[in-house]
Each structure stands twice: as C-alpha cells, then as structure tokens.
Amino acid sequence: MTVRKRFGQHFLVDESAIDRIHAVLAIQPHDRVLEVGPGLGALTTGLLESADKVVAIEIDRELVGVLKDRYEALEVIEGDVLELEIDQFSGMRVVGNLPYNIISPLLTRLFAHACLIRDMNFMMQREVALRLTSDPGSKAWGRLSVTAQYHCDITYLFDVTSEAFRPQPAVQSAFVRLEPRQRTVNPVDMEGFNSVVRQAFGQRRKRVGNALKGLKVPWQKVGIDPSLRAEQIDVDGFVRIANSCVGNAATTTGEGLE
C-alpha cells in the first residue's frame, strides 16, 4: 500500500488504541455513522459490527478499491469531504482519524451544519485538541476555541502516541468528542459573529477595544471592558459583542477558521 503524503496519511494500527476508541464511541444498533478517511479500515470493522449503517468518505482511489473489496456492507463515497454536501448526512454520528491538514477546514464546514449532526468524534493533532478544549485566559484560547465552543460541548477523551500509527507522525495525537448543542443565546448573524472573532484574534496583542475599533461596539452596554485582550473574553462575551453590531457592514466579511 502506497502512503500518499499529499493526503496526510497516517494509518492507525495499534489495537489497544482502536479498542479504546470503540469503547468510548459505544456505537448502538440504531446508529448511522459517517466515517471520514477510513484508510485501511482500522475503525471500520468495529463500526460495521455495531451500527445500523456506515458510510465512508475516502479521497484515495486505491483505498476506495480496498474498502469496497473488503466490506460488502460498507457504502463508500470516493471524494473530498471538504467538497461534499453535509446535509445528506443528517442525523449521523461522524467519526474519523483526520489528516492534520484538513482538521480546521473540516470543522468549519461541520460547524455550519452542526444542528444536523449527532456528534463528531475525531483523532487529531494534540495541539489542536488542546486549543479546542482550552479556557479563556490561556495562551491556547483563540479563534478556533471560541467558534468550536460556541457550536459544541467538547470533551478531550485521551491521548494517542505517535507509535500507534504507520507511518509515525511527527506529533502526538488525541481523540476528541464534539457534541452540537442548542444555545439559549445565539448571535443574530453567524457571519457577523465569525467576523468579530476573526478581527479580535487577528490582532491578539491589541486591546479588544482597539482591535474592534471600526465596529463602534457599545462596550458598557455589552458589559465587557474594552481594555481586555481577545484571549480574555469568553464565548458569550463574543456573542454579546456580535449582537451589538448587527447591521454593521464591518461585520459581514466571513472566512474559514485559521
């Protein structure tokens, strides 16, 4: 099997790590599962044994052939998950050992459809997992943290060493669960919320009052000290800022997560 670096392939081979993942997933007979990047099927076998249905998305044509030959019950979609319509997977649990180079753009796409997804369970670079689960005031708290924690309750489940993969990655990994939630407070405009967060963290060393100077935020009304820096403001603080700027043209430029 040829490992293709452009796809960021690191195949999970450690049986204890595989068993631990299946234990925390606790797939039920009624579950429908979307597996992103199944590779050689390290997780696929167990998923098929437990779930009602498993759909696998694989970009590597050679691996698509391997999966189709190996698993008669598996529905395999050949393609890039970043280009597929997420709506078609409504109600499914999402599982994946993710190539590190697609984590951020994939999460961006999934967050936009979070209300349709039951949960997301991903192997990812440990550094990213720490950012996802960080707290306001820490150095790891940033744009990804705010956006992810707005959309989901996130649980850092366990670490996985580089020795669990072939070829071994240069970094450590972690397995994380993201559970979409219904918030009692929501930005009126998600594009504006994303733009506010992007602008605030785009100038981390600046006080938030200066970083968002062009938005004319009514700081006293939103209850936030403008002398704070972005990493000191929690998710609901950014929600209040975004809500106070509804209709402001400066908040209408949205981009993917960094």
Can you describe what each PLM-predicted range is?
Residues 1-199, 240-244, 252-258:
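Catalytic cores of RNA-modifying enzymes
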Residues 189, 193-196, 200, 204, ...:
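Short amphipathic alpha-helical interaction segments
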Residues 169-170, 206, 210-258:
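Conserved Class I S-adenosyl-L-methionine
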Residues 5, 205-206:
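Hydrophobic alpha-helical segments, especially transmembrane helices
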